């Protein structure tokens, strides 16, 4: 279940990539090292007050093509631990039966919602050229955009126009395994997402997985994360997930475990000492939640014991294999007071 930040050199499609470049996931028993999009090491993005890391680093993962992200989801779905066959309520029950459909021939263009009827539901999508995506087992409902020439083949399932699907809300505060629309099923805005198991979901800018301009970002962490959900996005929860999850507070000794924190809200601004709890570790500091290269203020892997960092109000701190301890000036016994 642990994720570790490590340097990566493997090819991009040879392993599962997650939000951190070189993030190792054991969410599904996978212990594969993930590569960066470029496969090359680069300097950290810093401002004038932040010194570049002296350690070898790999560029943190940014948003990626939606097609790459959904292919990783299809890999995960080959042996899902759970399949959600729930049929949502719809305005008009005009479900299309399983079969093969070609957009422009026996299927109109538009966005559809595909639902498995059993644990043996499979889905194949192609762009009519050389692009294809296959879910050997479709683990839950999925939004899919069809354009002229695209084909859709579903077995042991059904589908309907997405516009006919009523709001799919949370049950007892949790969104079940499935695909949801931001602005319809999920409110837009900055929030924390996760569960008692952590966070395991993907945010897509579009449900057209063959659109070269569509992007996606996958999270697979042992803790809740912050994200700015925007209207029109599609979110695929790979486990039951809640919004507005409480970020864990400080330990009894005042330290903070690995996780994601907003400085000025979850932790105070000021100096902190980093204490490694794992030999493979790392941290990132974000200016904002766009999760692009310009969002990154600082990051470092394989942090040495005693490393001191200064966290500014309004930034986001995220770590793996590290404890965050309020800094104590040499010769004193108590951490200095900081203000929120």
Predicted regions and their residues:
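Short, surface-exposed beta-strand/strand-loop-strand elements in extracellular ectodomains
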Residues: 118-130, 197-209, 279-292
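Bacterial N-terminal signal peptides that target proteins for export
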Residues: 1-9
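Beta-sandwich interaction modules
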Residues: 100-103, 130-146, 179-182, 215-229, ...
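Noncatalytic modules at the cell exterior or secretory-pathway interfaces
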Residues: 144-156, 226-238, 309-322
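Short loop/turn and low-complexity linker motifs enriched in small/turn-promoting residues
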Residues: 66-93, 115, 153-172, 194, ...
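A glycine-anchored, Pro-Gly-centered beta-turn/N-cap motif
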Residues: 97-99, 108-111, 178-190, 259, ...
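C-terminal motif of bacterial Sec signal peptides marking the signal peptidase cleavage site
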Residues: 19-22
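N-terminal, intrinsically disordered, polar/charged segments of Gram-positive cell-envelope systems
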Residues: 26-98
